[in-house]
């Protein structure tokens, strides 16, 4: 969470969990996580299997293992204290520019631009008259421009960043912006240009029938097995868990091998069972 009484570690965990996951889904899992593992030392010492199970339905469970690696790095290289420079933070596993900037700005009031997808969209529409940013990640020029727009006081700058994030999430949305309700639409370059559409517009990513869904089904089955205290599942049961109506015949084997390669699951040659990593 971004409250003043939350530790640097708690804030970092929250920001990593919030990547690509709605905050409403993150909050209860974050609370349980922080009660169980309140420090980097606790997470570093936990088993990978317990970490993945606690990640629950946040999605993209590889983030859970990166967070464990992040905790281990903080313990080994920073004495268990979360570093507070952009350079050191972005060297941690699973921590990119946005996550690092969010921690510095919202937790410590350090003056740094926080560029999530909402902020980037608001700025490119208002200033450039484009529907969407031209690049997937912020360019150096985009970051420098955002920095120049921030007030000098770091705490004030953080409030501006939060306001832009909320504005983009609630008003200047991705596909259905509420321009008629927008307080600044008379000054917005995109509105003044007649809301021109970009040639390449983002489209909702499908989930049903995809490899991502099949991977999720395998991970859910193994999380359940671990929670129930069993010694994993047979390979056949794992492949059956990945079968989706309408999916191609090779999908279960494909996603099974991908999860093995990514270190998300383990096949024990002695027991001939598939488990979460230890």
Describe each PLM feature range.
Residues 243-244, 262, 275-278:
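Auxiliary Fe-S-binding modules of radical SAM enzymes
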Residues 260-274:
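A short, conserved structural fragment
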Residues 245-260:
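Short amphipathic alpha-helical interaction segments
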Residues 103, 254-258, 273-277:
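Residues in the recognition helix of alpha-helical DNA-binding motifs
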Residues 235-246, 273:
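Small/polar glycine-rich anion-binding or flexible loop at a beta-alpha turn
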Residues 1-212, 221-233, 246-249:
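Catalytic cores of DNA base-excision repair glycosylases
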């Amino acid at each position: 969470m971004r409250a003043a009484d939350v530790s640097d570690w708690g804030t970092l965990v929250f920001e990593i969990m919030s990547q690509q996951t709605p905050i409403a889904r993150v909050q209860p899992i974050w609370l349980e996580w922080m009660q169980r593992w309140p420090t980097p030392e606790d997470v570093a010492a936990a088993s990978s299997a317990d970490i993945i199970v606690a990640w629950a339905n946040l999605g993209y469970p590889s983030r859970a293992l990166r967070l464990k690696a992040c905790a281990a790095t903080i313990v080994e290289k920073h004495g268990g204290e979360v570093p507070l420079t952009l350079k050191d933070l972005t060297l941690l596993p699973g921590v990119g520019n946005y996550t690092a900037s969010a921690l510095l700005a919202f937790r410590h009031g350090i003056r740094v631009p926080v560029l999530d997808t909402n902020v980037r969209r608001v700025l490119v529409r208002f200033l450039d008259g484009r529907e969407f940013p031209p690049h997937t990640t912020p360019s150096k020029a985009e970051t420098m421009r955002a920095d120049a727009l921030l007030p000098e006081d770091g705490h004030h700058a953080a409030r501006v960043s939060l306001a832009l994030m909320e504005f983009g999430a609630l008003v200047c949305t991705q596909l259905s912006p509420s321009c008629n309700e927008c307080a600044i639409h008379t000054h917005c370059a995109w509105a003044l240009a007649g809301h021109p559409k970009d040639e390449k517009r983002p489209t909702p990513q499908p989930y049903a029938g995809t490899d991502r869904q099949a991977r999720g089904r395998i991970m859910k089955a193994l999380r359940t097995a671990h929670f129930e205290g069993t010694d994993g599942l047979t390979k056949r049961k794992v492949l059956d868990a990945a079968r989706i109506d309408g999916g191609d015949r090779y999908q279960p084997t494909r996603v099974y091998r991908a999860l093995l390669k990514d270190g998300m699951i383990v096949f024990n040659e002695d027991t001939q069972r598939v488990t979460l990593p230890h």
